[in-house]
Amino acid sequence: MILIFGGTTEGRIVSSVLDESGKEYYYSTKGAFQEVDLVHGERVSGAMTHEVMRDFIREKDIHLVVDAAHPFAAVLHKTIGEVTAELGIPVLRYERKYSERTGKVIECASYEDMIKKLEAQPCHRLLALTGVNTIAPLKPFWEKHESFFRILDRDDSREKAEAAGFPFSHIRYFHEGEDQALFDEIQPDAVITKESGESGFFEEKIAPALAAGVPVYMITRPALPEHYEYVYGPVGLRKAVERLCPDFFPLKTGFTTGSTATAATAAALHALLHEGEVLTEAAILLPSGEEVKLPVERVEKTELGYKAMARKYSGDDPDVTHLTEICSEVV
């Protein structure tokens, strides 16, 4: 059995991939607000403590955990890491795409660090795009400086804002595509956000401020447990599930000859550029833009360069090239 921690766009993708198996699985979220269509999954709602998660995994005979939760769900990630390490359960992290850190925004390691940098600017009118859960930790700043927080138009978000004592006159609600209009209304002298990635509309959030020359401060995403294995799209997810839970999908998938040849070429090129360093797997980009890793069985020096071999795996599809050695030499 597989347990997904979702509540995100990535969680929806993971559930849709697992539904292709026709097998049951569990989909866990902290709240019941996300609308997600589960064909074969069973919804589980409510925060899990260490003990609750450990008992659930044991009781439901979970053999694989997929962490597709929000990157800033730090407590959940920590709990998943501790419980799975204790029980010896593998974890796949379905990771979202993040913008390259280019220095165009001011990075902050914590909310305390962010407050210090805002005070040093100094900032007198703040637009916070960090969400309702950041109102409380940023209270030392907004108690002294005019600040506007954008939150989701939901009762639970309003309850959290009220509990923190934040004035509702300075609350704005999220509406997709209205980043520029909100910036024009508030006219802030600083904007703060989180490193939320493409599915968190990171670039759209910061574009108005950057265009106006207004400083943008970003909370960097917290580190994840070291034993996590990362996948970056539906193909990589399915291949990893096939490897870790061999009986979950009735049919195994494979890669094309072209993808296999690309992996061999990447390994040969790497050896040529890095003094013969041998890769046992090579990362390639599929036409969809997803990064996947394919195994490389052999890398050897030739008279003019390096040659690598990757073996073609076609899965359960009938293919005469299945298990064929695909070689590529780079000179």
Where are these regions (language model features)?
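A short, flexible N-terminal coil/short beta segment enriched in small residues
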Residues: 1-24, 69-77, 112-148
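N-terminal beta-loop-helix "entrance" segment that forms/cooperates
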Residues: 26-48, 103-106, 158-164, 290-295
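Short, polar loop motifs at secondary-structure junctions
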Residues: 27-35, 94-99, 132-134, 152-157, ...
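Glycine-rich, highly charged phosphate/nucleotide-binding loops
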Residues: 41-57, 171-181
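Glycine/small-residue-rich loop that forms an oxyanion/phosphate-binding "nest" at active or ligand-binding sites
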Residues: 54, 60-114
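Anionic-ligand binding region
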Residues: 129-172, 176-177
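A C-terminal functional module that forms or caps the active site or interfaces directly
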Residues: 160-212, 217-221
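Generic N-terminal targeting/processing segments that precede catalytic cores or assembly contacts
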Residues: 249-331
